[in-house]
């Protein structure tokens, strides 16, 4: 198929372009041109197809692209065709908007013959109208505002304009300003007025209202403008803008008194700027935004952040907000003490102090240990010492009440000395720990003993968890520093049967707060023994080091946590000596019992 100019149409090559005459109309004018190369025709067709696809992706229909290409020609560039499409599309939209069908479609009638009720669609108000309808009406005391802006000397009408503009910027539409009518008269030297033209401009906009006044017999009769202000604000449920408290009007009607107390908005002028307070009814009242609304917005009840921050020393009594503190409800000291009392094990009834502290003469200072029936000798292992005043009730036993001291061929295991239940765990009296860490150390030294034997002979110290009983126990007493009580540590060790314990280093004290007296002179042995070198595997050395270390860890932890918690956790983990790990275990133990 050929055109009159002797040129084949491109639509034969690309059937998708058959909608339009893609020939160049301008090329047909004049002399006929020779036929182009088929490769060139195919390239031009593919380029044209790319343009068409591009315009279709932009959202234009085939008819719009057809008309634009017929008007501009195939060789027009993309920007020119796109500009034509934009113009054509905007014109089409205007035609569609102008030709909208004014008659609505008839409603669907259900079967049964009953006519449906006409659907009444409430007109949706614009967002600005909704916002303004939610705001309260504003009634401004014009005389008070103008005199305040004029520093109580000049009636400055500019102050009224500043107040009106402030409320207009917030979206208020119902604004009324009351001014006595004599203020629009010619000003006198004794009553100066500035910017008087503002009153007339606001009156034309129906914002300002002049209260009536007249002259009778050469005298001006002025109506009380304050009554106009309060009455209109009360009837319209609005807000009064004034620094006057209207005491005389509060006494006239009880409802006016309450209304003035709740709806009076005071203000200040700062460098020609109208500034009402952010809290019109005080610190604990509503915000200014909610004060000017009919329906207050829900506000976040969040306390003001504490000005001291982390340096605040008020604790839970601080009424400000601390973001660094946990959100859980704070407990008072009394509640903490009650919770700790629930965690502590039940205590046995304590007898009188006279029964707690028996006389030294009535205290037997002996401890007998029977060998097992299967032992080869079958003898009784016993150690006796003369009664002395060096023992107290807190250091008389080496095992909890109701437990006998196990003996296995003269070999003692430290793990058998430890209590296995929480109820049998000993605890230190709290009244002995109320004096601080110093009292605690003296209490611990009294319970365990810091050294044993003579000065030339260092003995191992007893650990704090071998167990001890309360005052008044009926178990046989043991010397305060006997090696049987000091046998705590890893591994077993043996004690010779003919071993005689050394005399005590410190005499007894009647009260724990008394200082230690000077130690008695040590008797000189006739046959001094040679100091035996301690082997690396000596169990006495290991026991001594372990007991000292556990005693130090216990003392440190008791300065932070209650003693019964420390004893309970260290009883559960006898081989654990790391204070940090023990502290973590104490916290977890405490949280578990709190949850219970």
Swiss-Prot record:
Q: Modified residue Phosphoserine is at which positions?
A: 99, 344, 435, 439
Classify the main location: nucleus
Q: How is it modified after translation?
A: Phosphorylated by IRAK1; phosphorylation is necessary for subsequent phosphorylation by the I-kappa-B-kinase (IKK) complex. Phosphorylated by I-kappa-B-kinases (IKKs) at Ser-435 and Ser-439 upon lipopolysaccharide (LPS) or IL1B stimulation in macrophages through the MyD88-dependent signaling pathway; these phosphorylations promote rapid ubiquitin proteasome-mediated degradation of ZC3H12A in macrophages and hence allows its target mRNAs, such as IL6, to escape from degradation and accumulate during the inflammatory response.
Sorted UniProt keywords: Angiogenesis, Apoptosis, Cytoplasm, Developmental protein, Differentiation, DNA damage, DNA-binding, Endonuclease, Endoplasmic reticulum, Hydrolase, Immunity, Inflammatory response, Magnesium, Membrane, Metal-binding, Neurogenesis, Nuclease, Nucleus, Phosphoprotein, RNA-binding, Stress response, Ubl conjugation, Zinc, Zinc-finger
Residue ranges of every copy of the RNase NYN domain listed in the record = 135-290
**Cofactors required:** Mg(2+)
Under InterPro entries, the record lists:
Rege-1_UBA-like, Regnase_1/ZC3H12_C, RNase_Zc3h12_NYN, ZC3H12/N4BP1_RNase_Reg
Describe its function.
Endoribonuclease involved in various biological functions such as cellular inflammatory response and immune homeostasis, glial differentiation of neuroprogenitor cells, cell death of cardiomyocytes, adipogenesis and angiogenesis. Functions as an endoribonuclease involved in mRNA decay. Modulates the inflammatory response by promoting the degradation of a set of translationally active cytokine-induced inflammation-related mRNAs, such as IL6 and IL12B, during the early phase of inflammation.
Q: Name one GO cellular component term.
A: cytoplasmic ribonucleoprotein granule
What protein does this entry describe?
Answer: Endoribonuclease ZC3H12A
| Free-text domain note | The C3H1-type zinc finger domain and C-terminal region are necessary for pre-miRNA binding. The C-terminal region and proline-rich domain are necessary for oligomerization.
Using the UniProt annotation, give all residue ranges assigned to the region (Necessary for interaction with TANK).
81-150
Disulfide bonds listed in the record: none
Q: Which family does it belong to?
A: Belongs to the ZC3H12 family.
Recite the UniProt cofactor note for this protein: Mg(2+) is required for RNase activity.
Chain ranges of zinc fingers (C3H1-type): 301-324
What is the primary gene name for this protein? Zc3h12a
State the species of origin: Rattus norvegicus
Q: Where is the composition biased (Polar residues)?
A: 356-368, 383-398
**Protein's UniProt keywords contain Phosphoprotein:** yes
State the residue spans of region: RNA binding. Answer: 214-220
Query: Positions of the region Disordered?
Result: 24-44, 92-134, 278-306, 339-415, 447-467, 517-542
């Amino acid at each position: 198929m050929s055109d009159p100019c002797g040129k084949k149409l491109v639509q034969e090559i690309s059937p998708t372009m058959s909608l339009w005459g893609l020939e160049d109309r301008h090329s047909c004018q004049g002399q006929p041109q020779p036929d182009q190369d088929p490769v060139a025709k195919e390239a031009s067709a593919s380029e044209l197809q790319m343009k068409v696809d591009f315009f279709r992706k932009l959202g234009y229909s085939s008819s719009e692209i057809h008309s634009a290409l017929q008007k501009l020609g195939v060789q027009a560039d993309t920007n020119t065709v796109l500009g034509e499409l934009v113009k054509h599309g905007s014109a089409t939209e205007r035609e569609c908007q102008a030709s909208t069908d004014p008659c609505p479609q008839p409603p669907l009638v259900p079967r049964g013959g009953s006519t449906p009720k006409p659907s009444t669609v409430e007109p949706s108000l614009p967002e600005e109208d909704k916002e303004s309808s939610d705001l309260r009406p504003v009634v401004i005391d014009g005389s008070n505002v103008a005199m305040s802006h004029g520093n109580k000397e000049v009636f400055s009408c500019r102050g009224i304009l500043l107040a009106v503009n402030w409320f207009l910027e917030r979206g208020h539409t119902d604004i009324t300003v009351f001014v006595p009518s004599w203020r629009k008269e010619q000003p006198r030297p004794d009553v100066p007025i500035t910017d008087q033209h503002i009153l007339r401009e606001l009156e034309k906009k129906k914002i300002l209202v002049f209260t009536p006044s007249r002259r009778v017999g050469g005298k001006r009769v002025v109506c009380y403008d304050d009554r106009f202000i309060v009455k209109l604000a009360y009837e319209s449920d609005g807000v009064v803008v004034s620094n006057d408290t209207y005491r005389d009007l509060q006494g006239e009607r009880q409802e006016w008194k309450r209304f003035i107390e709740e709806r009076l908005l005071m203000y200040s002028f700062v460098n020609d700027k109208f500034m009402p307070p952010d809290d019109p009814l005080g610190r604990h009242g509503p915000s200014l935004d909610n004060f000017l609304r009919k329906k207050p917005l829900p506000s976040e009840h969040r306390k003001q952040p504490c000005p001291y921050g982390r340096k605040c020393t008020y604790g839970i009594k601080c009424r400000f907000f601390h973001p660094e503190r946990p959100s859980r409800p704070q407990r008072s000291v009394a509640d903490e003490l009650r919770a700790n009392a629930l965690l502590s094990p039940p205590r046995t009834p304590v007898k009188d102090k006279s029964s707690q502290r028996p006389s030294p003469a009535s205290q037997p200072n002996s401890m007998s240990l029977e060998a097992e029936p299967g032992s080869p000798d079958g003898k009784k292992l016993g150690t006796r010492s003369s009664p002395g005043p060096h023992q107290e009730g807190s250091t008389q036993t080496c095992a909890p009440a109701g437990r006998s001291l196990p003996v296995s061929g003269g070999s003692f295991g430290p793990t058998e000395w430890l209590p296995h239940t929480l109820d049998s765990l000993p605890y230190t009296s709290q009244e002995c720990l109320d004096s601080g860490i110093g009292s605690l150390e003296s209490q611990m030294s009294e319970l365990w003993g810091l050294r044993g034997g003579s000065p030339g002979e260092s003995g191992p110290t007893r650990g704090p968890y071998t167990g001890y009983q309360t005052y008044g126990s009926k178990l046989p007493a043991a010397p305060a520093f006997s090696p049987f009580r000091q046998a705590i540590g890893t591994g077993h060790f043996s004690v010779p049967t003919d071993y005689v314990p050394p005399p005590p280093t410190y005499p007894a004290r009647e009260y724990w707060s008394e200082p230690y007296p000077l130690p008695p002179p040590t008797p000189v042995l006739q046959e001094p023994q040679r100091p035996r070198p301690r082997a690396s595997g000596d169990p006495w050395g290991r026991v001594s080091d372990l007991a000292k270390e556990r005693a130090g860890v216990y003392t440190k932890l008791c300065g932070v946590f209650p003693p019964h918690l420390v004893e309970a956790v260290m009883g559960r983990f006898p081989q654990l000596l790391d204070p940090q790990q023990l502290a973590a275990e104490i916290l977890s133990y405490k949280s578990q019992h709190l949850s219970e």
